């Protein structure tokens, strides 16, 4: 038996999934879509797929509490066999919403998914195009992990396993509490003022996962990239997309005549040490930002405000405080974690889920021998917060995914969010 360290984010996602199960929202899955111009090479893809499973025992691991020391660890009893890649027959259209929604609920055409990764290849159209759906369990993968996994599959080999991992040193509870207290105090300030998401008390929490893709053209993507560089520089992308997401949520509040003085946004921050072989387990921590609703009037103002709050958070070591607070919470029973978060946050978890997945397959134009047209990720979200906005980027082509649950967001609201996001990204007002 192999014991591997778990991160605080592993615990957070396990707690979130426990809440989703109890509230009828199922398990937490994501789907990454690869649009190819030709059929991928079956031998290359199968070899890498089987090597991934043979080299990474995390794919068969379970998150468990270690009684000695009372901390969460990944427990594995060895590797698991790779599930066969599913090669579908010729279809006139690429896999549609019903297929992807089924995968987001952890199901395939033959029943419930029993492994954390599921790979399918769909031929479509008359010119040899193919679509790959990679369905993945969020408990074991995040955006960074998906990027690393795709690089291994694209290369056609994964002969190297993960590096040896050691348990982090123990700290006294007093030191952890001291590091967490400034964030605890700030959260109390926020909740006393009120902070809403796309969900509020009395709204349903169930319903199947829904999504809308906002696919920018190459010209629109170039305009968005130019705006990003003008406002944030060449290396800091997250504040630009965080500002866009916050303004989209603010529009939703305005349309519903809701008033939320602050928007509580979690900015993803690299938590684990970087390694191209450390694919599974969650890499990212969170930098909690508390954005003032009145400072988001235009995208330029919103980006400046996010950057100001980001610098403030870095100065106050808020990402470290967030990790410390989750470390304290990890001593709770898993089933009580999210209910405790909601109790302290007046029914909410945060204002919305948001992430920029980074650029897929940088420098690569092919995947398993087939030219790539586009790659994007479609995650599922819970309610609350009821809305997720996720940005994918492949070779300069930007795709935004809106994700929600059931009837939590109306079709008219989705159309309005689509227009606001396109306007903010391109700088061109949408009709």
Q: At which residue positions do the language-model features occur?
A:
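Histidine-centered divalent metal-coordination motifs
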Residues: 56, 137-138
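Acyl-thioester-dependent acyl-group transfer interface
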Residues: 1-71, 88-117, 216, 220, ...
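Structured interaction and signal-relay segments at domain junctions
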Residues: 73-85
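Catalytic-site-adjacent helices and loops of nucleotide signaling machinery
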Residues: 197, 230, 234
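Non-catalytic, low-complexity flexible loops and terminal extensions
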Residues: 1-15, 88-90, 127, 140-225, ...
């Amino acid at each position: 038996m192999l014991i591997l360290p778990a991160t605080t984010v592993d615990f957070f996602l396990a707690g979130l999934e426990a809440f989703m199960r109890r509230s009828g929202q199922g398990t937490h899955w994501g789907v990454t879509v690869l649009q190819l111009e030709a059929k991928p090479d079956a031998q290359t893809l199968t070899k890498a797929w089987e090597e991934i499973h043979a080299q990474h025992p995390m794919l068969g691991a379970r998150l468990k509490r270690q009684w000695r020391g009372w901390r969460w660890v990944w427990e594995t009893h060895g590797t698991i066999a790779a599930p066969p890649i599913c090669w579908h027959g010729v279809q006139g259209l690429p896999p549609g919403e019903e297929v992807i929604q089924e995968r987001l609920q952890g199901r395939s055409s033959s029943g419930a998914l029993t492994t954390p990764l599921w790979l399918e290849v769909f031929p479509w159209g008359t010119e040899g195009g193919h679509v790959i759906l990679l369905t993945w369990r969020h408990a074991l993968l995040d955006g960074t992990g998906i990027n690393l996994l795709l690089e291994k599959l694209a290369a056609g080999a994964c002969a190297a396993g993960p590096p040896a991992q050691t348990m982090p040193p123990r700290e006294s509870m007093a030191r952890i509490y001291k590091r967490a207290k400034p964030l605890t105090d700030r959260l109390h300030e926020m909740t006393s003022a009120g902070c809403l998401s796309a969900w509020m008390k009395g709204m349903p929490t169930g319903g199947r996962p829904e999504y809308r893709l906002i696919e920018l053209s190459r010209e629109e993507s170039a305009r968005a990239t130019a705006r990003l560089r003008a406002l944030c520089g060449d290396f800091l992308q997250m504040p630009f997309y965080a500002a866009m997401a916050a303004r989209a949520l603010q529009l939703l509040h305005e349309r519903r005549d809701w008033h939320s003085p602050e928007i509580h946004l979690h900015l993803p921050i690299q938590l684990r040490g970087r390694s191209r072989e450390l694919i599974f387990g969650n890499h990212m921590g969170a930098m909690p930002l508390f954005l003032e609703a009145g400072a988001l009037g235009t995208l330029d103002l919103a980006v400046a405000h996010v950057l100001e709050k980001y610098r403030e958070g870095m100065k106050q070591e808020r990402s470290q405080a967030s990790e410390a607070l989750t470390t304290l919470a990890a001593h709770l029973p898993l089933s009580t974690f999210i209910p405790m978060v909601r109790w302290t946050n007046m029914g909410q978890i945060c204002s919305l889920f948001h992430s920029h997945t980074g650029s897929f397959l940088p420098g690569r134009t092919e995947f398993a021998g087939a030219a790539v047209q586009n790659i994007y990720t479609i995650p599922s979200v819970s309610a609350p917060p009821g809305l997720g906005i996720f940005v994918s980027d492949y070779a300069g082509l930007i795709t935004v995914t809106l994700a929600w649950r059931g009837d939590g967001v109306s079709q008219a609201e989705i159309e309005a969010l689509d227009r606001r996001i396109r306007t903010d990204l391109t700088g061109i007002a949408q009709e």
